[in-house]
């Protein structure tokens, strides 16, 4: 797995995003061949399907830098467009590498070959139709492409926010391996301050809706958390899970609660 650091990428430059995605897809595919497999069956599975996990981190960082409020329709529209671009670039890259190196073993008869993958997601623009034809003609190097990891540790090194989660606070202490690390919202300034809403202050329905929007473009799963307070009832928590299911979200990672003092 690897993650695009969205808060540190010029996400409004499609050509640059495409270039980075293509590079990461090639790198992840190479890892499959170079990796050490202590379990033989893991090697068999990896070489059969050649699945990779291209994900993201710095999601809230990106929104704040672009002055987009988490609880807004602008947020949903922005990430719908961005993740479609990322997915398009990843599929295009995998198909091109299939032409260069060969498709994964079970491409024939798959949703990729039949075009069902594109139909299920409503990818029907002329640009997507061209890519669909290319995939049918050239094949796919990888059976699965996108998966979003938590990145709670690696995001610290990258100086950005974790995965697709909102920040816990503009400033907080986080325990890592027995040590307390001070965390400050990246690029915090008078301009970005108002776009960093604490995770537990966010209406979780907005987070669920955003996850559903992204899921259309993510063929695997997303590390998505619920942030609730002790004011939540069991019915409200259940409703969040039902909402996630209705939005097509595949998984929910943790339910992180906060007690009001």
Question: Would you name each region that the model predicts?
Answer:
Residues 51-69, 236-249:
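Hydrophobic/aromatic-rich, well-ordered segments within soluble, folded domains that form packed cores
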Residues 28-33, 117, 121, 134-141, ...:
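Catalytic alpha/beta core of large soluble enzyme barrels
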Residues 21-43, 69-151, 240:
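Internal maturation/activation junctions in enzymes
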Residues 43-49, 76-84, 225-233:
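Conserved short loop/turn motifs at secondary-structure junctions
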Residues 1-46, 56-66, 160-161, 167-191:
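Function-dense linear segments that define catalytic or interfacial modules
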């Amino acid at each position: 797995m690897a993650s695009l650091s969205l808060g540190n990428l010029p996400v409004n430059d499609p050509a640059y995003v495409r270039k980075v995605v293509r590079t990461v897809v090639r790198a992840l595919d190479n890892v499959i061949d170079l990796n050490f497999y202590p379990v033989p069956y893991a090697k068999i599975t990896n070489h059969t399907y050649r699945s990779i996990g291209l994900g993201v981190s710095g999601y809230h960082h990106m929104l704040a830098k672009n002055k987009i409020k988490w609880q807004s329709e602008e947020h949903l529209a922005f990430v719908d467009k961005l993740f479609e671009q990322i997915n398009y670039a990843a599929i295009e890259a995998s198909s091109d590498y299939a032409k260069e190196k060969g498709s994964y073993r079970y491409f024939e008869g798959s949703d990729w070959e039949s075009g069902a993958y594109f139909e299920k997601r409503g990818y029907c623009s002329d640009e997507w139709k061209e890519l669909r034809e290319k995939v049918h003609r050239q094949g796919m190097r990888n059976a699965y492409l996108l998966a979003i990891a938590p990145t709670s540790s690696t995001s610290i090194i990258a100086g950005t926010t974790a995965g697709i989660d909102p920040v816990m606070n503009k400033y907080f202490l986080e325990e890592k391996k027995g040590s307390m690390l001070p965390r400050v919202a990246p690029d915090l300034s008078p301009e970005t301050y108002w776009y960093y809403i604490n995770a537990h202050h966010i209406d979780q329905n907005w987070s669920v809706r955003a996850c559903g929007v992204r899921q259309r473009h993510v063929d695997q799963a997303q590390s998505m958390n619920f942030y609730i307070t002790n004011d939540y009832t069991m019915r409200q928590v259940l409703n969040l899970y039902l909402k996630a299911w209705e939005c097509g979200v595949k998984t929910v990672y943790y339910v992180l609660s906060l007690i009001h003092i």
